[in-house]
């Protein structure tokens, strides 16, 4: 059952959807999903469908939209606001995080930042980076990345539309060493899913994330697939569902 919600975030209203689990026992646990750069909570409909499937009989799911193209510091603050809302209103026994791409970096920083209130029981990193610099040079291009470091606004025109992003988006990235944060993940289940042919966040970054993290960890490469897992999204979703069932 889907329920829309809106909360007061640190930089304005945050809107999202709760999939309240169809099984009463499943409502004791919540998966919070964080989308990627220039993405949305619906994920072209696929993330919404996965949330529906998980919410049927595994656990409740919360997904939401970050402020558009906001920098990592702001995304971390917004994810914390959503987690506060989840803990206060849903009172779950276990909270899980699932971060796609840049949302994965947001989850790592939030989960491993040393605040117990924001540390989940388990975490899924879906096409998530290990090096923000390497990743955003690939995403933006070397020239645009370097120009942003010198204060020039980032202008993107592509199939996703026209976006003008403040240069502080790039300079803010240098405040966060994702790898150093992830080294603090010492216990708890961790599932890493990554496309074998990902050219946006290279597959070696998933391997590095797997090697430096602790806990009960699992790395699954999606054979022949890209950053968005266009070929094997359904298979990746089944991995997430199976992993949740084992850890609830």
Question: Where on the chain are the PLM-derived regions?
Answer:
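Glycine-rich nucleophile elbow surrounding the catalytic serine of serine-hydrolase chemistry
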Residues: 99-109
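Aromatic pocket-lining residues of Rossmann-like dinucleotide-binding sites
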Residues: 54, 110-114
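N-terminal cap/lid segment of alpha/beta-hydrolase-fold proteins
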Residues: 1-26
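The alpha/beta-hydrolase serine catalytic core
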Residues: 4, 10, 14, 96, ...
């Amino acid at each position: 059952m889907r329920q829309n919600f809106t909360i007061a975030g640190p930089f304005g209203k945050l809107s999202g959807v709760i999939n309240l689990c169809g099984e009463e026992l499943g409502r004791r646990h919540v998966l919070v999903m964080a989308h990627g750069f220039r993405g949305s909570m619906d994920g072209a409909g696929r993330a919404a469908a996965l949330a529906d499937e998980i919410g049927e009989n595994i656990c409740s799911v919360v997904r939401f939209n970050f402020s558009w193209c906001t920098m990592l510091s702001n995304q971390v603050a917004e994810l914390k606001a959503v987690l506060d809302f989840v803990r206060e209103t849903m009172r779950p026994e276990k909270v899980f995080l699932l971060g796609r791409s840049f949302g994965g970096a947001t989850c790592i920083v939030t989960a491993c930042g040393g605040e117990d209130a924001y540390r989940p029981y388990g975490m899924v990193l879906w096409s998530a980076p290990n090096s923000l610099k390497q990743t955003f040079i690939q995403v933006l291009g070397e020239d645009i990345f370097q120009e942003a470091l010198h204060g020039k606004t980032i202008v993107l025109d592509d199939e996703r539309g026209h976006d003008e992003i403040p240069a502080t988006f790039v300079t803010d990235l240098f405040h966060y060493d994702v790898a150093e944060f992830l080294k603090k993940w010492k216990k708890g289940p961790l599932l890493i899913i990554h496309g074998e042919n990902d050219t946006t966040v290279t597959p070696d970054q998933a391997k590095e994330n797997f090697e430096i993290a602790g806990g009960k960890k699992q790395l699954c490469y999606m054979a022949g697939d890209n950053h968005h897992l266009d070929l094997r999204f359904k298979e990746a979703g089944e991995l997430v569902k199976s992993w949740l069932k084992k850890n609830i």
